Design a protein with these regions (language model features):
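Nucleotide and nucleotide-moiety/phosphate-recognizing core
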Residues: 2-104, 115, 119-128, 135-140, ...
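A hydrophobic, small-residue-rich beta->alpha segment in the mid-to-C-terminal subdomain
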Residues: 151-152
Length: 170
């Protein structure tokens, strides 16, 4: 059993924010693997299905980014999912735009969504860091991550989503 988590903020005006790239990845996984219709459960939008013969859950927390851990803990406790079977997709300023880095455990590196998950389930889970790059002009990081992607960046996010979908093997 696996749990895919996409981090983001649940407001309609946040849909194309850099901070919401995790939600975009979950939407792509849901579509690619024909997971169930999203249902509001465990303080998130939950889908279920199978990838190969493996049971999969995918969730977009509705608790806002900085409280994502609450949603994840409820879900893993209910379905008895080990933290080691959780894969979190999230934005990362320290990774060049269009690049992906995966890691298991470690620090939150200042990402409040990851810090929240660490607080509620520990650090023994996988993270897929999706590069959004750093701001090109003098802009606060908090403002940058809440800006919408440019059109050409959205095309890059689609390529990243396709690459992740092709890489999912259980």
């Amino acid at each position: 059993m696996l749990l895919f988590v996409g981090l983001g903020n649940p407001t309609p005006d946040s849909e194309n924010n850099r901070h919401n790239v995790g939600f975009k990845i979950i939407d792509s996984i849901n579509k690619k693997f024909g997971l169930s219709k999203q249902k509001p459960k465990f303080k998130g939008l939950l889908t279920t299905g199978n990838v190969g013969d493996q049971k999969v859950y995918a969730i977009k927390p509705l608790t806002f980014m900085n409280n994502s851990g609450i949603c994840i803990r409820e879900l893993i406790e209910y379905f008895k999912i080990d933290a080691e079977d959780v894969i979190v997709f999230h934005d990362d300023l320290d990774v060049e735009f269009g690049k992906i880095k995966a890691k298991f455990g470690g620090s939150s590196a200042g990402h409040n969504g990851i810090a929240s998950i660490d607080k509620f389930i520990g650090k023994d889970y996988s993270r897929v860091r999706i590069g959004i790059g750093k701001p090109k002009e003098n802009i606060e990081v908090g403002d940058f991550v809440l800006q919408n992607f440019e059109e050409e960046e959205l095309a890059g996010i689609e390529k990243i989503s396709n690459h992740i979908n092709e890489s999912i093997s259980i």
